[in-house]
Regions:
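Cytosolic regulatory regions of ion transport systems
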Residues: 1-121
């Protein structure tokens, strides 16, 4: 399965490393190159420096062929924008958005975006 992950923080890097280890085709995006140091040694996926809310960056990451999209940065607004682009612009069938404010979950659900947050994990 082809996966794009936006955000190479603790959660994003951990998920990218695990999915790549399981044999999935993983592309992880982050605006800060140093964030990729969190990836497991020998990470077999692709790490791209870029903004996950930029359609040209998502295009370069292969969003048109992607099956799963995870927006896992530390910012709720950035995550929802990236998730909406994944769903609406690229038609990615499975989109998950990390949020820090659980009050936003209902709003995002009306947009067809599934969410996770720390308080529910």
């Amino acid at each position: 399965m082809r996966v794009i992950i936006v955000g190479s923080g603790r959660v994003g890097a951990g998920m990218a490393s695990q999915l790549a280890e399981e044999g999935h085709e993983v592309v992880i995006l982050d605006t800060r190159t140093e964030s990729f140091r969190r990836l497991a040694p020998g990470f077999s996926g692709q790490a791209l420096r870029g903004d996950g809310t930029d359609t040209s960056v998502l295009e370069r990451a292969g969003a048109r062929e992607c099956e799963w999209f995870f927006a896992l940065t530390n910012g709720d607004n950035r995550n929802i924008l990236a998730a909406q682009l994944a769903r609406e612009h690229f038609g990615i069938p499975h989109v998950l958005c990390k949020i820090n404010d659980p009050v936003r979950a209902k709003t995002y659900a009306t947009l067809g975006i599934d969410t996770i947050n720390r308080t529910e994990m």
